[in-house]
């Protein structure tokens, strides 16, 4: 058993737990810094740098990037380090990662071109551009609020070979629910 072939899972777990010493050792021994296969702990197949961003560990994110981590790799739900920082409202980390991402990913004209095949209703586009992005449900027992992505941060994802757009950044009490736009059905989905 060699670290270069089988060390990716352990490396990602070490980074997720903030164990810099073990992460350095595994990387020195050849672990894949961009490993992103699903397993029982990480079913969405994130990279180590995405996990560091999820845990708001800016020093770890910086170190991983210095070591060659690819911040453009998205997990199975379309999350990448930048979008995780946005979800976590970690502006310092989001700004840092945005400065390193391809410029056209944050260009509105390019976003319009990218999202055109999704046939989003004009009212939804306008709402995502102007907000409010936080929806309040004070009378509901289980979900008091949900926060949508801004138009520029809407994420593309694939589920069962269908292209979808992820519209929701966070929801009260349910961290793993998704609000999705299906261009094929021209409807909102939730998972």
Question: Which ranges hold each PLM region?
Answer:
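A short, surface-exposed interaction/processing loop segment used at functional sites
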Residues: 187-191
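Ankyrin repeat domain, specifically the short helix-to-loop turn at the C-terminus of the second helix
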Residues: 1-2, 24-33, 62-70, 96-102
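A surface-exposed partner-binding patch
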Residues: 77-182
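Conserved ankyrin/ankyrin-like repeat signature
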Residues: 21-22, 59-60, 92-93
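Ankyrin-repeat boundary/"N-cap" motif
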Residues: 2-13, 36-48, 74-80
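Internal alpha-helical scaffold/solenoid segments in large eukaryotic proteins
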Residues: 51-75
């Amino acid at each position: 058993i060699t670290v270069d072939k089988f060390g990716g899972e352990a490396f990602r777990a070490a980074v997720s737990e903030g164990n810099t010493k073990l992460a350095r050792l595994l990387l020195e021994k050849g672990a894949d810094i961009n490993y992103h296969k699903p397993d029982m702990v990480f079913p969405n197949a994130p990279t180590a740098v995405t996990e560091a961003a999820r845990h708001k560990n800016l020093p770890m994110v910086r170190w991983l990037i210095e070591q060659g981590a690819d911040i453009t790799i998205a997990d199975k739900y379309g999350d990448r380090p930048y979008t995780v920082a946005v979800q976590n409202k970690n502006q310092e980390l989001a700004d840092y990662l945005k400065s390193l991402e391809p410029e056209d990913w944050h260009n509105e004209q390019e976003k319009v071109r990218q999202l055109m095949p999704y046939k989003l209703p004009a009212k939804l586009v306008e709402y995502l551009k102007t907000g409010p992005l936080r929806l309040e449900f004070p009378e509901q027992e289980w979900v008091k609020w949900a926060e949508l992505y801004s138009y520029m941060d809407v994420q593309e994802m694939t589920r069962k070979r269908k292209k979808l757009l992820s519209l929701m950044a966070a929801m009260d009490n349910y961290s793993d629910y998704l609000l999705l736009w299906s261009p094929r059905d021209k409807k909102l989905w939730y998972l």
